[in-house]
Swiss-Prot record:
Catalyzes the condensation of pantoate with beta-alanine in an ATP-dependent reaction via a pantoyl-adenylate intermediate. Pathway: Cofactor biosynthesis; (R)-pantothenate biosynthesis; (R)-pantothenate from (R)-pantoate and beta-alanine: step 1/1. This is Pantothenate synthetase. GO terms for biological process: pantothenate biosynthetic process. It is an enzyme of class 6 (ligase). It is found in: Cytoplasm. One of its GO terms (molecular function) is pantoate-beta-alanine ligase activity. NCBIfam families: cyt_tran_rel, panC. It comes from Anaplasma marginale (strain St. Maries). ATP binds at residues 28-35, 145-148, 174, 182-185. Keywords: ATP-binding, Cytoplasm, Ligase, Nucleotide-binding, Pantothenate biosynthesis. GO terms for cellular component: cytosol. The reaction proceeds by a bi uni uni bi ping pong mechanism.
Amino acid sequence: MEIVRDVESVRAVLRPFTNRKIGLVPTMGALHSGHLSLVHEMKKHADVVIVSIFVNPLQFSPGEDYEKYPRCEEVDCEKCASAGVDVVYIPSAEGMYPDGFSTSVDIGPMARELCGASRQNFINGIMVVLIKLVMQTNAHCMILGEKDYQMLHLTRQLFRDLNIGVDVLQGNTVRSAEGLALSSRHQYLSSAEITKANFLYGFLLEVGQQLSDDPHGQQEIIARGKLRLEQEGFEVDYLEVRDNNTLEHMQTFRKPARVFLAVYLGNCRLIDNVLLA
């Protein structure tokens, strides 16, 4: 396994694979079983698998956890080697965004909804780094997890709109035995908070069932759901149901749909979603 840290090196190490299919797994590090499942899925689709590890400053707003985001490069590289990764790419912020870098991306109004409503730089900052990563690696395909479904949907839109010929694959959400969607930020939680967070997946399934049973009661179901989350000790960022294919609001509930939530528990922001098909 090769470990490279700048664009010249990553291009040099990948040059012999010009005629092979290159698959990119973009991450911010602090790898867990969810990331490794993306690696294993990508190995089914690509001849060469490259994992990028980069805590992207563009997607963090002032006061967020950029500085304290967990970084454990040595352990991450060991996990990648065990998973059969071919190349690990660990660029620096200075290398990705040198002095004078000023380009931005605005993918449109949906970047300011759901996670983008409260995290003003989040979606568009991710889009910049994903464009750079696929251009730097000449990837043929990339994989993102279903847990970040808004990002997955908008990345596909971006690549389609700009004629970027990279397939964006969807990896399944990996959950703990109790149903909690895995996240690197779980390191911020105490054991008691982890136990409390285990409530969320079952709650989402319950909301989904209520919507299926009463499609005309959408507003009331969501309002009750927010109240329930608050009663359970969560600070609610959003609880919403959207059209699965467009992410638009629905005046009348219909399938396929997706229920999204984002909540705060202590200092940790947790997101999840479920498909209603």
